[in-house]
Amino acid sequence: MAKISFTPARHRRRKKVLKMAKGYFGSKSTLYKTAHEQVMRSLQYAYRDRKQRKRDFRKLWISRINAGAMLCGMQYSRLMHGLALAKVDVNRKVLSDLAHLQPETFAQYVQLAKETLVQFQQTFKKKENQSTKLQEVQSNQLAQTEEKTSLQLEKVLSNELSEEKSDYALETQPQITQIKAKKPSLDLSKMLLPELKKLAKEHKVPNFNKLKKTEIVSALKKALAKK
């Protein structure tokens, strides 16, 4: 088999790297090793700065728009908010060019943003007032319904209590009559003299201390008969 040689590929690779390193200082453009290192580093920087460039331009556009808006008596954030509410599809690049090159047309955009912000605030206040009125009406309705429900509950509870009382009275009446019927009558003749004197004192018999037992018994019978 024939021997394979990598010299053509190696030469192409070296020429490619040295071509990319053309214009570098010193050995970075002549020697392959240092040129390759510098090219790899340069490619990384280029990848990073392609993205950083977009950020830098956005900062520049915002600073130009802010400067133009401050000259017209408005902030950048309020200007962009007003244009968004007005549904103006103009990007920051165009606005920055207008603020830098055509300040009169840029002032018209600022005026449009101011008017839309005023209209938005008015509509927002109207909606707030309507919402507060609705909340007041709803709170009043809730309070009325709560009062009605509380009154209904009180009525129901009072009716239930009256029914329970009537049922309890009907149930207890025969028991009371039975107890009264079963209540034994006092046998005064079998009681002792001090017990009779206590009863006489309770029933307010006059001069019970001077009376005899038979007299106290007769007086107590008369007092109990009156009751």
UniProtKB/Swiss-Prot annotation:
Keyword rRNA-binding: yes
Gene3D superfamilies: 1.10.720.10, 6.10.160.10, Ribosomal protein L20
Keyword Ribosomal protein: yes
Superkingdom, taxonomy of origin: Bacteria
Pfam families per the UniProt record, alphabetical: Rho_N, Ribosomal_L20
InterPro entries given in the database record: Rho-like_N, Rho_N_sf, Ribosomal_bL20, Ribosomal_protein_bL20_C
GO MF entries: rRNA binding; structural constituent of ribosome
Coiled-coil stretches: none
GO-annotated biological processes: DNA-templated transcription termination; ribosomal large subunit assembly; translation
Keywords: Ribonucleoprotein, Ribosomal protein, RNA-binding, rRNA-binding
Protein purpose: Binds directly to 23S ribosomal RNA and is necessary for the in vitro assembly process of the 50S ribosomal subunit. It is not involved in the protein synthesizing functions of that subunit.
Family indicated by similarity: Belongs to the bacterial ribosomal protein bL20 family.
PANTHER family, alphabetized: 39S RIBOSOMAL PROTEIN L20
Full protein name: Large ribosomal subunit protein bL20
Gene label: rplT
